[in-house]
Amino acid sequence: MKRLRSSDDLDFCNDKNVDGEPPNSDRPASSSHRGFFSGNNRDRGEDAAGFSRAFSRRRSNRDLDNHRPDARYHRSESACFSRRAFPKGFRSERERPNRDASVSSWRRFGGPGNDFGVDDRDRRLRDAERDRSLKSPSWSRDSPNELSKFKPLDSRNSRSRSKSLASPTWSKDSGSEQSKSVGNVVKKSEEEVQGKSSTTSSEMEEGELEPEPQPETASGLAHQTKHDCKLPSCSADDHKNARIDRSFQEIGKSAQLDANTESNRELSHVGGNREMETTDSMTDKKSVEDAENVPEHATESMHVSQNNVNDTSTALAIEHDHRDGTITASANKITDTVDEKGDKDEDYKENLHGVKLEETLYPDVPERLEELKEVKGNDGDANKAEVEGPECVEENALANRTPAEYISSVSDSSVHKCKDKGKNSDVPLTHLVGNALFSESKTEDLHDKDKDEKDDNFGGPSIRGFELFSSSPVRRAKKTEQSGVNKHKDEKLLLEPLDLSLSLPDVLLPIGGQDTNQLGSPVRSGSVRSLTDTFCTNSDGFTMSMSFSGSRSFNHNPSCSLSHNIGDNEQSVHSRPIFQGIDWQALSHNDSKYNENTVYQRLMENGNGSVQPRAMKGNLISGQADEEHLRLPDGSSKAANILEKQLSFQKSVDVRSACPRTGSLENGSKFTVEKKTAKDFYSGSNSWITGLEAGGHDFVETVIRYILSDSMPVMTKRFHEMPTRNITSLKENIRQMMLNMDKNVQLGAFQDALQNRTDITLELLTKSHRAQLEILVALKSGRSDFLLLDNSISSSHLAEIFMNMRCKNLSCRVLLPVDECDCRVCSRKDGFCSACMCLVCSNFDMASNTCSWVGCDVCLHWCHTDCGIKESYIRNGINASGAPGMTEMQFHCVACNHPSEMFGFVKEVFLNFAREWKFERFCKELEYVNKIFSSSKDSRGKQLRQAADAMLASLKSKLIGLPEACNRILGFISDCDSSTPAETSAPFIYEQPKPRHERGSPSQDTAWLRSVCSDNPHNQLKRSASVADAFHRERQVEICAVEMELERGSPKEPRFEELESIVRMKQAEAEMFQGRADDARREAEGLKRIAIAKKEKIEEEYNRRMGKLSMEDAQERRRRRYEELEAMQRGQREFYEMKMRMEEEMRGLLTKMEMTKQSLAL
């Protein structure tokens, strides 16, 4: 790896001011050479490393105090390289200092009991200001150059700082010696602090948030030292002074200026005057608020240093003021030239960074300053020779700055030393963390933190454990206000914080995205920037990989393996998770414990753990856009999320795949296409037809998943909004898919999904769209016929079919259970219809008058012949009507376990329907006969099977025709039946019951089994007539068979025996007809009684209703007449009253007339 090795490279980096803009005069002179080179880990001092580590591990929100928007501060030159030049997963080993040396620095920013409290700090500040006003009343902000008269010249930090300013190009020998001496001095100071605090060093792990008991802070030590030094001579002061004197002598021996220092000084004279003028002008323009920006601790330290300055240091400061001012101006010019080439957008943030770093670096400064001041007070002559050297240069440079800049320079020099021999570049961890923090923080955020945490101390939880997962993948580019000096400069060199964390880049934001505050954007934390811009970023130590989102590639350390689970380390020290696309903010904000199963479940939704970006400068990715369009009007996307899971689980791959690009892009694109086609389908767009042609059944399955997953009201609304042509096409495509045998597995999955739906009720189904209801019923029943229905079947019937309340056979559609049957099959199987469904497989077909179905003689439940043979429900059983030990083929009913003999069943089927069959159907029935009696053990069954085989072979070979074959098989069946004695005593021969869907009523076939008091007399009469007709046909068939036998001329027994057999047959027939006649007579008597009872009941009901109706009419007439009477009476009364009034008036008029006549007569 290539790195800067000499001063030439450094000069090359500092001489990049090609535009020649004037440098910024208000920057500190030491900003351009702030510890630019550093040694390796083994060469660094434990104190410096520990101090840097303390600030990298603990950044308190107290750093945000005293923030002012118009203050200007600058970052170090390590920020002048591009962030993208370094690999994402790299973390330098030089930024991992020893833990042993970091504890004391970490504790320095103590707990509630330290001297950094607000009240004590304000009190000390007021005391310092009062003392300062008494000692130096002439000092003002308008004369910053006069401050050099009161600056202490005996500071070791100032002396070291002047060397870094004056000679940036060290020799190998001088650099090494200086690093050693400075390390010793700092280490001694740290040991003194640790001796007073009496604390025990212990390692702090990254996850630990609670510090150990806090020692006294540096501010408290500074005051204590000041107070103790005022006492008369004591042994402790003598010992301390001797130790400091030895340190000063070592610094004096090693602090030899290089030859290049003179050349730099000559160069600095060129821009010295201009720099001084600019500095003065910028100081005059500072407002009263700028004074408030000075950190309180830094102000206190400045006052303490001013009050303890002796006459010797003042004289030396005046003597070297002019000579070192030009050197300081030259350093400022070089710094401004390099720093201001960066972007102006981050200038304001970097200024904030300067203020906060000065405040945080303060605690190490006061105690060393006061120690040196006391030494100068006691033994100024002895140390005069050591002070006169290079320390005056730094003192004069510090004199030209504001108090905050002065303390910053002293603090930087006390911590950051150049130790290496010009090989590596090292930037303080505190500066780097500060720059990174402030580059991501907004101004309003800083003000909020100032308000919320105004009373907090420096002690707080460590943030080092958050650095791994809090790095943001996207740079913030936020314009801030620029000062009047920098407004005219062009933005040439972009300065930005370097992101070296192990988090995945651009995981949730698209390329070019600007907003990092949106959901799912990780927050950037402070990153360690310790590499130069010449570092080789394409080395073999880093590999190209793909993020889980498949958005873009990134470089990372091979140790960050993709073989780990995604949620393995998500709970370490409550770190911010890497993937934040699934409401991570709420989880991390509430500190709720995260379930890892949720990670896998949500990440598997898009395949291979991919999370789609939400926005790309106003343009939504197709999958996200479709999801937005599919959302409900009330803003809910729950249904879309449920369906997204169902879609994604079938195409998801392992998130640990070594090639995440392929799985993520392919599955994501397929998922996006499915969602887009579904959206187009619902919106009525024509593009869904193109998607159907391209996707085929996949598109139909996608829409079906939406239908099955969404709630019923939502899907009903969407069906109402769909065009009619889309609905028709959808039904047709679903029907084609159901007819495709390759989709049986998928159809079964759809049926299981519907079976698990508990929110579908009969009320919702009746209110749903007709097409939606037909699709649901077709999918659940597995019958595509429901997709071709017209309006002949009502929606209520379809809803009942879906709820298993009605038979799904379109030819049956009886209410379930049939005849309120409570057998073990009807009561256990939902939606089972005993009239048309198989007892074994629960399926139905349109076959009738066939041997492919067998029925029970008692309960009339049916079963497929193939199912009965397969499940051994058709087997050999004991013949109850024959001799003991005889067997026959029987069907043992699954519902009632009653055996029904098969020979009589086959005989009835052939006698009644054989003449109506076609050739193919006749051959099929013969095959079923062969199947039924294939395992028969009785003679009749065997003979019938052999006859069926011979007849089937003859038909297939065209030896005989269909009519002749039918006559032969019928004659053979009749002959077998008549030659068996057991059959002659059969009490009853019945015809083949038809399937229930071909009967007029479910109770029609069971009427003859019921009591004579049945409620269906018409059916009983019809049954009796049908039985008689059947026996007449049977008789004719038997006669024909006998005649055929006689015509064959086969050898027979004597004619007498034949006659006897005919007589026996006639007697049997007579007995049979007599029995049936008796049955018919009994049925007729029963019907007569029923008719009489019905008539009586009807007459009684008629009379009751007529009487009730007559009474009501009479009452109604009476009420009307009464009302008429009352009306007439009221009219009569009114007439009588009117008459009386008229008579009274007439009498009055007559009286008046008489009086008038009398008066006229007089």
Swiss-Prot record:
Query: Which residues does the annotated region (Disordered) include?
Result: 1-235, 251-307, 321-346, 441-485
Q: Which InterPro entries match?
A: OBE1-like_PHD, OBERON, Oberon-like_PHD, Oberon_cc
- GO terms, biological process: cell fate specification; embryonic meristem initiation; embryonic pattern specification
User: Taxonomically, which superkingdom?
Assistant: Eukaryota
Report biased composition (Polar residues) as residue ranges.
135-146, 163-182
Give GO MF terms, alphabetically: zinc ion binding
Q: Which residues form a coiled coil?
A: 1065-1161
Assign the protein's first listed, main location to one coarse class: nucleus
Where is this protein found? Nucleus
Comp. bias (Basic and acidic residues): 1-19, 61-77, 90-99, 118-134, 148-157, 225-235, 263-300, 336-346, 441-457
Q: Does the keyword Translocase apply?
A: no
| Regions that span the bilayer | none
Keywords attached to this entry: Coiled coil, Metal-binding, Nucleus, Transcription, Transcription regulation, Zinc, Zinc-finger
The PHD-type zinc-finger regions cover 835-899
UniProt keyword annotation of Coiled coil present? yes
| Phenotype of the disrupted gene, per the record | No visible phenotype under normal growth conditions, but the double mutants tta1 and tta2 exhibit a rootless phenotype and seedling lethality. No visible phenotype under normal growth conditions, but the double mutants obe3-2 and obe4-2 exhibit broad growth defects and developmental arrest of seedlings.
What are the Acidic residues biased-composition ranges? 203-213
GO cellular component terms, alphabetically, are:
nucleus
Subunit details for this protein? Answer: Self-interacts. Interacts with OBE1 and OBE2. Interacts with OBE3.
Annotated function: Probable transcription factor that functions redundantly with OBE3 in specification of the hypophysis and establishment of the embryonic root. Involved in the activation of ARF5/MP-dependent gene expression during embryonic root meristem initiation. Involved in shoot meristem homeostasis.
Quote the protein name from its UniProt record. Protein OBERON 4
- Native organism is Arabidopsis thaliana (Mouse-ear cress)
